[in-house]
């Protein structure tokens, strides 16, 4: 008996037919005193090309303290018969109490009024005050200057941008410390080896303390610590829907899909901020340091780099994928572009042949939080008080390429085998050394999967891979790689690989 015949027998013996399927998705996000609700309704049920159930609509209810069990259990928000009404544009429901737990249910019904009461159609929300920024990446658009769209509280903002000339500079658009907690919490410090803050640096001249007069230790190689910049706690939510990759950034955890991998310690605790090195790593007395006025450490194995970083103290290590991914997302958020060189500055990106081609640390002691050069000027840039693109690849923890698959881990402990990592199941394809054309997003971040773009389309950065070994990721690019630099991903090197254009940084 065919599926349709069996279904027809059931229908013939059921007065109201069968109930619709579960909703495809119900997304409920907290608001200050309310909730933002989006519903992807079920499709009609079709078996053997025969229509079995027509979805007429769904009933939205909300209930305090417990999930609605039926279509009459709770407060009716709306009975929706325009099925796509809240698929893309959210329903804003107000009048709720912050800190109180509510449950929102969407009960689909057929054209006979038969409801689906499955518990899978329910979502929990706790309203609270928050700041939420975001953007989506239109995957159908290859233009790096139009594919990013602002949403949420930054929907009407003007983006930041490097000053596109030979003298350099930066414009901050609508973004400011007054409206953005990320900028407010981004501050330069001298930090002791035990992880405690010693003192704050002048924001426009790191050679001075915050008073702008007293000399700092930013160039003092004997200082028992490093120059570091804080990034305040950011909760991130990533998801893909209708050829759009959504990136949301919040100052609080609005729902369980918001995570803070870049701020999570090995014991699972979440820090109120993380420290990023202000300078590329230099090797001083067997410690990987962030100190101005030094040459970059190069030609070391990854194992040595990790050891030198940990020699600073128990909490130190080289960089890691979750913080690099977050930095790349913030570059996109602030500049509304996926062309990192045009938007943030080119960096020391071309003409390099040996270690003396690399920029010395502390080249941009002045100029403020952001600085860069346009017009393909070959000078390093600065983002959130941290010098970037100084000429060498940055080796990081947390991203391996094992048997041709990306393996990722957001927090310590890390290893070189992929044990305990998440196998994303994703691979890079195309000609190694080409420009990134396609990237797939998971909850952990974005992973290049197809090469074949160009320097001014899609993501404008390069990708390298080797599926025949266990590769330890390098990111950013080097001054040997020209326009491929920026957000480049290189999973083409064993952890033992050394070169004049590979370095690392100490993170805390």
Residue ranges of predicted features:
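Short S/T/G- and acidic-enriched coil/turn segments that sit immediately N-terminal to beta-strands
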Residues: 86-92
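Beta-strand-rich modules
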Residues: 93-116
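Enriched but not universal
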Residues: 1-18, 26, 498, 505-507
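N-terminal module-boundary/linker segments of secreted carbohydrate-active enzymes
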Residues: 128-256
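C-terminal, surface-exposed recognition/capping segments
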Residues: 133-137, 325, 346-365, 388-389, ...
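Solvent-exposed loop/turn segments flanking beta-strands in beta-repeat/beta-sandwich domains
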Residues: 42-75
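Short aromatic-cysteine micro-motif
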Residues: 218-225, 252-389
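Pro/Thr/Ser/Gly-rich low-complexity, intrinsically disordered linker/stalk tracts
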Residues: 9-54, 98, 114-129
């Amino acid at each position: 008996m065919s599926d349709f015949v069996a279904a027809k027998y059931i229908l013939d013996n059921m007065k109201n037919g069968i109930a619709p399927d579960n909703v495809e998705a119900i997304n409920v996000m907290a608001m200050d005193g309310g909730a933002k609700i989006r519903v992807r309704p079920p499709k009609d049920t079709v078996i053997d090309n025969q229509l079995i159930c027509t979805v007429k609509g769904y009933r939205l209810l909300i209930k305090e303290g417990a999930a609605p069990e039926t279509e009459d259990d709770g407060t009716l928000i709306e009975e929706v018969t325009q099925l796509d009404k809240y698929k893309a544009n959210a329903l804003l429901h107000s009048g709720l109490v912050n800190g109180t737990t509510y449950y929102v249910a969407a009960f689909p019904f057929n054209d006979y009024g038969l409801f689906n009461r499955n518990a899978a159609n329910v979502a929990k929300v706790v309203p609270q005050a928050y700041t939420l920024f975001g953007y989506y990446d239109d995957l159908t658009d290859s233009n790096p200057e139009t594919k990013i769209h602002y949403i949420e509280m930054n929907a009407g903002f003007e983006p930041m941008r490097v000053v596109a000339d030979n003298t350099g500079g930066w414009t901050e658009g609508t973004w400011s410390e007054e409206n953005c907690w990320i900028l407010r919490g981004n501050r330069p410090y001298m930090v002791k080896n035990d992880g405690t803050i010693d003192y704050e640096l002048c924001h426009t001249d790191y050679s001075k303390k915050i008073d702008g007069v007293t000399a700092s230790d930013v160039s003092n190689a004997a200082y028992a610590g490093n120059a570091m910049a804080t990034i305040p706690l950011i909760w991130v939510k990533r998801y893909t829907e209708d050829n759009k990759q959504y990136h949301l950034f919040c100052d609080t955890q609005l729902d369980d899909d918001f995570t803070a991998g870049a701020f999570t310690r090995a014991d699972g605790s979440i820090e109120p901020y993380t420290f990023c090195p202000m300078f590329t790593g230099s090797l001083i007395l067997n410690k990987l340091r962030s100190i101005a006025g030094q040459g970059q450490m190069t030609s070391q194995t990854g194992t040595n780099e990790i050891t030198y970083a940990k020699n600073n103290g128990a909490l130190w290590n080289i960089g890691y994928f979750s913080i690099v991914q977050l930095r790349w997302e913030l570059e996109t958020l602030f500049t509304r572009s996926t062309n990192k060189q045009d938007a943030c500055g080119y960096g020391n990106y071309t003409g390099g042949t040996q270690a003396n081609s690399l920029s010395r640390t502390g080249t941009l002691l002045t100029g403020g939080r952001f600085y860069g050069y346009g017009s393909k000027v070959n000078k390093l840039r600065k983002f959130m008080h941290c010098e970037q693109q100084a000429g060498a690849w940055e080796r990081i923890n947390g991203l391996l390429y094992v048997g041709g698959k990306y393996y990722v881990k957001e927090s310590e402990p890390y290893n070189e085998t992929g044990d305990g990592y998440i196998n994303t199941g994703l691979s890079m394809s195309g000609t190694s050394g080409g420009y990134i054309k396609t990237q797939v997003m998971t909850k952990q971040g974005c992973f290049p999967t197809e090469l074949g773009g160009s320097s001014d389309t899609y993501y404008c950065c390069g990708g390298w891979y080797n599926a025949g070994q266990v590769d330890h990721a390098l990111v950013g690019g080097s001054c040997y790689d020209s326009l491929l630099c920026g957000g480049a991903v290189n999973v083409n090197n064993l952890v033992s690989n050394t070169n004049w254009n590979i370095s690392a940084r100490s993170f805390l």
